[in-house]
């Protein structure tokens, strides 16, 4: 068995209908990601198992946008000599079809009722009620139908009422399991997300999405919205996830941040392809390496995060290092 396993970690790619045309200046940064992986990741990383995408693959959930994303991800897979289907993804707010979740639609009415719930018990009760009601259960996933059918389904990461979360297992070097686990944070996402210009609408997760405890399993979750963007009374869901998920990957905020809460490592990823109108435009992505190490007869999970950042000249991705460090990665 190989010593460690690795992943390429992307988030917020935002492919548009113009991506790849003759005037797309962001084609350069995507090319530089491919070049960086070819020149550097292949020599630094052992046993790359896949590409992780924490949502906002598309800009407006159009089929053509997902087709372009698929081509880009295939190029990465080809460089790494892994299967083109070794992609693991979750939806973001840009992956919803806003024409489905319009005001007055059945979905919008259900979302509005869910948004009114103000306790964990009420949230879980309403989610369970709508999910079990045959007249409405499929409606909860209607706004990501294009995402599911034209993109995520190709990687077995599509979600629905029968499979609200996906999971994939990889063997660790101590014969235990690393389990990737997809969380859906866009249940109530709609065109109203930014209706209040002073604050964003908080998203609902629900306890039904918290992975179950299982001996010998280490969880690494993917979710678009981080916990500070959740409507989570008393932080009930977050507390459960912090206890059960050792590595948590998030997107959405376009801010690179790594922190620890007890035994859980929380990685907020910067945007791979942010809008150039965004203040502090700063394309980023990560490499992640995971292994179990033994120290004085005890075993520990060792995680290395290689933070990659585009240079100001936009000519290559390099390691984002602390001023006082020469390390190419952060180790936890």
Residue ranges, per PLM feature:
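Active-site environment of divalent metal-dependent phosphoester hydrolases
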Residues: 16-18, 58-61, 91-104, 190, ...
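N-terminal active-site segment of His-dependent metallophosphoesterases
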Residues: 1-90, 96-101, 208-214
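Conserved beta-sheet core of the metallophosphoesterase superfamily
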Residues: 175, 227-298
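Extended active-site neighborhood of metal-dependent phosphoesterases/phosphodiesterases
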Residues: 70-196
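Beta-strand-turn-beta hairpins that frame and shape the catalytic cleft
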Residues: 1-8, 163-182, 217, 260-265
């Amino acid at each position: 068995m190989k010593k460690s396993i690795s992943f390429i970690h992307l988030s917020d790619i935002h492919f548009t209908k113009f991506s790849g045309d003759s005037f797309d200046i962001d084609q350069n940064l995507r090319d530089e990601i491919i070049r960086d992986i070819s020149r550097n990741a292949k020599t630094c990383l052992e046993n790359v198992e896949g590409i992780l995408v924490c949502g906002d693959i598309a800009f407006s959930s159009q089929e053509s946008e997902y087709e372009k994303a698929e081509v880009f991800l295939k190029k990465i897979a080809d460089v790494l000599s892994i299967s083109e289907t070794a992609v693991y993804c979750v939806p973001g707010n840009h992956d919803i079809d806003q024409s489905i979740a319009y005001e007055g639609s059945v979905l919008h009415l259900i979302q509005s009722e869910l948004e009114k719930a103000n306790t964990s018990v009420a949230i879980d009760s309403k989610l369970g009620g709508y999910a079990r009601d045959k007249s409405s259960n499929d409606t909860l996933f209607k706004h990501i139908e294009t995402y599911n059918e034209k993109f995520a389904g190709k990687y077995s990461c599509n979600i629905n009422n029968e499979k609200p979360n996906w999971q994939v297992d990889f063997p660790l070097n101590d014969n235990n399991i690393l389990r990737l686990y997809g969380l859906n944070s866009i249940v109530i996402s709609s065109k109203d997300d930014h209706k209040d210009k002073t604050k964003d609408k908080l998203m609902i997760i629900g306890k039904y999405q918290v992975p179950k405890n299982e001996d010998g399993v280490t969880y690494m979750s993917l979710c678009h919205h981080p916990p500070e963007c959740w409507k989570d009374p008393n932080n009930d869901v977050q507390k459960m996830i912090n206890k059960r998920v050792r590595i948590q990957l998030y997107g959405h905020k376009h801010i690179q941040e790594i922190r620890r809460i007890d035994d859980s490592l929380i990685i907020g990823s910067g945007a791979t392809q942010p809008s150039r109108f965004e203040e502090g435009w700063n394309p980023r992505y990560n490499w992640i390496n995971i292994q179990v190490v033994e120290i004085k007869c005890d075993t520990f999970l060792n995680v290395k995060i290689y933070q990659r950042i585009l240079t100001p000249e936009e000519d290559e991705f390099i390691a984002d290092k602390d001023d006082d460090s020469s390390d190419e990665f952060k180790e936890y």
